[in-house]
């Protein structure tokens, strides 16, 4: 055989075990069962373990170098040990204050404010450093792709483009129990008959657990392009790390080519500048993602996972402008701005054809109820982010 078969088992992207497979002399259509002994692996709390098999060329050939990756596959192993739970009562004390403008939470070295006007987290700072620049907002739109334009998505789903900014706060409730502040905010967009319930839990270490639940009452509405949140981050937060699929962009219906692992890079490099500006840079099955400036940062830990992207420009720069000459290489440039999109999902990109076909129905966010959760964890430069991601508060 002109191929070599290797395997590796990783936990938190650290090699636990590895080896080579013998020659697999199989005819087309034949199969063979491989057995891996996992008894020597001692799982650590909260760590996922993956087996990755790679097939590479053994010899150099015309047009194909030696060691060229021909095929690979990844398997999540049935090895898991639950993370250690931290009791919120063991953390530093926090205080909750209510006023006409909303609810304010103060703890040791941090502050979180939830305003009636925005209906979301509006201020979040640690040691005097703002971790978000403006109030969070519900984000239900995506910049149309070429496939979207071909199937009329901008017109069909126009109802959702500004649904997040149209929402009005109906209820804002705050309470303090077991050294945990709970804030429940109910927002309503009457035009789309949509209710968004946001539940925040704030802890004494500055972590904030976020749960977003959306309910669409009218079943006749078009699919929703995306369900998520958008955060305007400090412009100095130009470094991103994540544990999820990568390193390239991936989507709900386009993700099996992206392996789960630990990746890092600049925020700017996560965008691909297509000739016509459009949706770009999405990552799927994210266990955690962190933005930082090297000195301080913010992690979003999925509960259990989320999709998302980061952009060194306003995400709206990618939006379609009919009859415009906007060019991705010329007009999409890095700015003094970082947008962080943390999503439940966005609809698939489709591609059966580009002149009318929508994404398959099971990759659409049709009128229904959807919810997802994640937890913000502030950190300082140099912290072990894999270790930090194992924090579990209950």
PLM ranges: what are they?
Residues 2-3, 9-21, 69, 192-194, ...:
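Short beta-strand and strand-turn-strand segments in soluble, beta-rich domains
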Residues 5-64:
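Intrinsically disordered, low-complexity Pro/Gly/Ser/Thr-rich segments with frequent PxxP/GP/PP motifs
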Residues 11, 25, 37-46, 61, ...:
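Beta-strand/loop-rich accessory regions of lumenal/periplasmic or secreted enzymes
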Residues 16, 65-72, 131:
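Local beta-strand/beta-hairpin segments that build beta-sheet-rich folds
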């Amino acid at each position: 055989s002109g191929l070599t078969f290797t395997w590796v088992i990783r936990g938190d992207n650290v090699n636990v075990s590895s080896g080579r497979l013998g020659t697999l002399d199989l005819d087309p259509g034949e199969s063979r069962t491989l057995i891996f002994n996992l008894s020597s692996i001692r799982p650590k709390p909260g760590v996922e373990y993956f087996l990755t098999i790679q097939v590479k060329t053994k010899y150099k050939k015309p047009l194909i170098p030696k060691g060229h990756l021909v095929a690979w596959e990844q398997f999540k192993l049935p090895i898991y040990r639950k993370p250690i739970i931290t009791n919120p009562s063991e953390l530093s004390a926090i205080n909750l204050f209510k006023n006409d403008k909303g609810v304010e939470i103060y703890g040791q070295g941090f502050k979180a404010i939830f305003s009636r006007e925005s209906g979301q987290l509006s201020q979040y700072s640690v040691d005097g450093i703002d971790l978000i620049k403006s109030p969070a907002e519900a984000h239900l739109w995506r910049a149309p792709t070429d496939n979207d334009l071909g199937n009329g998505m901008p017109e069909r789903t126009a109802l959702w483009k500004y649904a997040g900014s149209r929402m009005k706060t109906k209820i804002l409730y705050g309470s303090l129990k077991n050294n945990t502040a709970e804030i429940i905010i109910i927002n309503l967009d009457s035009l789309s008959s949509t209710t968004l319930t946001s539940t925040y839990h704030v802890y004494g270490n500055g972590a904030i657990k976020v749960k977003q639940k959306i309910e669409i009452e009218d079943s006749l509405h078009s699919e929703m392009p995306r369900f998520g949140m958008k955060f305007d981050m400090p412009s100095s937060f130009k470094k991103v790390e994540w544990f999820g699929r990568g390193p390239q962009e991936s989507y709900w219906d386009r993700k099996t080519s992206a392996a789960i692992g630990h990746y890092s890079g600049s925020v700017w490099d996560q965008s691909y500048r297509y000739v016509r500006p459009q949706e770009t840079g999405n990552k799927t099955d994210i266990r955690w993602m962190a933005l930082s400036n090297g000195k301080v940062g913010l992690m979003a830990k999925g509960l259990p996972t989320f999709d998302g992207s980061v952009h060194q420009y306003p995400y709206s720069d990618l939006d379609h402008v009919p009859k415009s000459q906007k060019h991705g290489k010329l007009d999409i440039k890095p700015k003094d701005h970082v947008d962080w999109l943390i999503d439940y999902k966005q609809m698939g990109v489709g591609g059966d054809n580009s002149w009318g076909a929508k994404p398959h129905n099971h990759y659409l966010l049709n009128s229904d109820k959807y919810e997802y959760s994640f937890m913000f964890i502030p950190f300082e430069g140099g912290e072990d982010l894999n270790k930090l991601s194992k924090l579990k508060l209950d």
